Amino acid sequence: MRALLSVTDKTKIEKLAKDLCDLGVELISTGGTYQTIKEADLDVIEIEKLTNFPEILEGRVKTLSPYVHGGILYKRDNNSHLATVKELNIKPIDIVVVNLYDFQKALDGGNPEEIIENIDIGCLLYTSDAADEL
């Protein structure tokens, strides 16, 4: 089993990551979340290792990849999906742990550039993908 962790608010993320590791879950993570988990001396895979593509545009693009979204979205009971992910070597992502940027805080600040920077497309996509699999 694998989990993707990408959080803005890292409160207690080390504990959650440790608990997941103790359950035998393989952790995948992005940027600052990856660093926090790594500093807690836990095994974690950096998202770039999964996507085979570096984080670009100051972190704006880091996980938009079939290796991420395909791993979340494929239907585990669909033979066509199973054949596709096997052929493309896409591994399942079974758990998604995210929290969104504080958009309301940015909106209240009124700075248009800050507002745009706080539109969290990546975590919204993870949330949508994971919800599709419920």
For the regions a language model picked out, list residue spans one by one.
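Short, flexible loop segments at the rims of nucleotide/cofactor-binding pockets, characterized by
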Residues: 4-6, 72-74, 115-116
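Short beta-strand scaffold positions
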Residues: 28-29, 121
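Single conserved hydrophobic/aromatic residue that forms the stacking wall/gate
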Residues: 126-134
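Glycine/threonine-rich flexible loop motifs
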Residues: 103-117
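Glycine-rich nucleotide/cofactor/substrate-binding loop typically near the N-terminus or early
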Residues: 32-103, 124
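Internal gly/pro-rich beta-alpha loop/helix module
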Residues: 118-119, 128
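Well-ordered alpha-helical segments embedded in enzymatic catalytic cores
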Residues: 12, 122-125
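N-terminal glycine-/serine-/threonine-rich phosphate-binding loop
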Residues: 1-27, 33-45
